[in-house]
Amino acid sequence: MDSDSGEQSEGEPGTAAGPHVFSSKNLALQAQKKILSKIASKTVANMLIDDTSSEIFDELYKVTEIHTHNKKEAHKIMKDAIKVAIKIGILYRNKQFSQEEVIIVEKLRKKLNQTAMTMVSFYEVEYTFDTNVLSKLLHECKDLVHELVQRHLTPRTHGRINHVFNHFADVEFLSTLYGPHGNCRPNLKRICEGINKLLDDKIL
């Protein structure tokens, strides 16, 4: 079902958009339409990343741009993250996963839940932040995602998975995000508020 080969180049309109006009919601809609136009079933045409997740992605974009000093790279990372999330969502909703893969889905859910709670705890409890702990959890999530989509998606999408998780699991990026006196504290606050909402709503 993977349709990477027919995509536009990364220089498509919108790539150079600034942090105040970047919208993960719009990017998700564009990616979704492109992916859905190339698969037989249209039953997931109403699938969108929810508003809370969209807000988290937007804040991650801003922090990524601050960390990389590269608007285009920040956009590409978030675009890859959204594409991967949508493709996995399509596979799941269309019941494309085998029984063995459904077990991996549950492992991934638990690992994402653990990672989310750890992220919030590190923000809420002073002096507990440990880059290595959070980086390890994110790499474990990455390995489970690779295992889950192994027989469904192309090497190009596996490359996207690496691109996304290697960035967010990078200890220097995590230090930028959690820096107690850095510019990203307001972003981290909004990210953790969003994560808490997803946890309360049993989405994570």
UniProtKB/Swiss-Prot annotation:
Disruption phenotype: Deficient mice develop normally during the first 3 months of life under pathogen-free conditions. However, following subcutaneous injection of the carcinogen 3-methylcholanthrene, deficient mice exhibit markedly delayed skin tumor onset and reduced tumor size compared with wild-type mice.
GO cellular component terms, semicolon-separated: cytoplasm; cytosol; nucleoplasm; plasma membrane
Keywords: Cell membrane, Cytoplasm, Lipid transport, Membrane, Transport
Gene Ontology BP term (one): 1-phosphatidyl-1D-myo-inositol 4,5-bisphosphate metabolic process
Region (Disordered), start-end ranges: 1-20
InterPro entries per UniProt: TNFAIP8-like, TNFAIP8_sf
GO MF annotation list: phosphatidylinositol binding; phosphatidylinositol transfer activity
Disulfide bond entries: none
Entry comment describing in which tissues the protein is expressed: Widely expressed (at protein level).
Effect on the protein upon substituting residue 42 to Q: Reduces binding to phosphoinositide
Impact upon substituting residue 93 to Q: Reduces binding to phosphoinositide
Region (Binding to phosphoinositides): 21-204
Cross-referenced PANTHER family: TUMOR NECROSIS FACTOR ALPHA-INDUCED PROTEIN 8-LIKE PROTEIN 3, TUMOR NECROSIS FACTOR INDUCED PROTEIN
Stated family: Belongs to the TNFAIP8 family.
Role this protein plays: Acts as a lipid transfer protein. Preferentially captures and shuttles two lipid second messengers, i.e., phosphatidylinositol 4,5- bisphosphate and phosphatidylinositol 3,4,5-trisphosphate and increases their levels in the plasma membrane. Additionally, may also function as a lipid-presenting protein to enhance the activity of the PI3K-AKT and MEK-ERK pathways. May act as a regulator of tumorigenesis through its activation of phospholipid signaling.
Protein name: Tumor necrosis factor alpha-induced protein 8-like protein 3
Organism lineage: Eukaryota, Metazoa, Chordata, Craniata, Vertebrata
